[in-house]
């Protein structure tokens, strides 16, 4: 990545919809020159261009979950179990006592609480020794997060984590809106 690439990336961070002409004007390149550079950065895995959502505008709640998982095998199974969870935004392995951090969202406080305690929670995963659950108050610098709406298909009988919402007491008692990947989902996604 050189200085031209950095300028292009900086402009795309300001406005991901900037045209190749606008980018070219900033860096002094033609439309085709900028297009080639952007495509090369995308195909090389350096950048991606996608929509992010202001979760605060939707009144969603973000949470940071720290987990200590007993083994690499259990960690791999946990990563696989939640790979297609629409509420999990990011999972980070850590080099610390807690060896996994998860950034997730919930549609409301009750669902957030269920997300921390029910069968579909990260805490309930086999091999988890301990967890810490930190609801996030404010998101600073940019409120936009990459919510995985493409996973909120509302068409499955069973959630990606292999839990059935329709048999869950929290779902039945309307304390949880259900998984956005299932046909039982009652939320806004």
Model regions and ranges:
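A compositional/biophysical signature of low hydrophobicity enriched in polar/charged and small residues
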Residues: 1-189
């Amino acid at each position: 990545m050189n200085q031209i690439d950095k300028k292009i990336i900086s402009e795309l961070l300001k406005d991901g919809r900037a045209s190749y002409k606008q980018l070219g004007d900033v860096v002094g390149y033609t439309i085709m020159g900028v297009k080639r550079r952007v495509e090369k950065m995308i195909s090389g895995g350096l950048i991606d261009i996608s929509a992010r959502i202001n979760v605060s505008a939707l009144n969603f709640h973000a949470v940071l979950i720290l987990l200590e998982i007993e083994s690499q095998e259990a960690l791999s199974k946990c990563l696989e179990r939640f790979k297609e969870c629409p509420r999990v935004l990011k999972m980070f392995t850590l080099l610390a006592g807690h060896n996994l951090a998860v950034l997730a969202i919930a549609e409301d406080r009750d669902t957030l609480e269920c997300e921390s305690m029910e069968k579909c929670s990260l805490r309930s995963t086999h091999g988890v020794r301990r967890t810490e659950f930190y609801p996030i108050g404010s998101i600073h610098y940019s409120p936009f997060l990459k919510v995985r709406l493409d996973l909120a298909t509302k068409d499955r009988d069973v959630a990606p984590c292999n839990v059935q919402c329709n048999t869950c007491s929290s779902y039945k008692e309307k304390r949880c809106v259900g998984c956005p990947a299932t046909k039982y989902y009652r939320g806004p996604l």
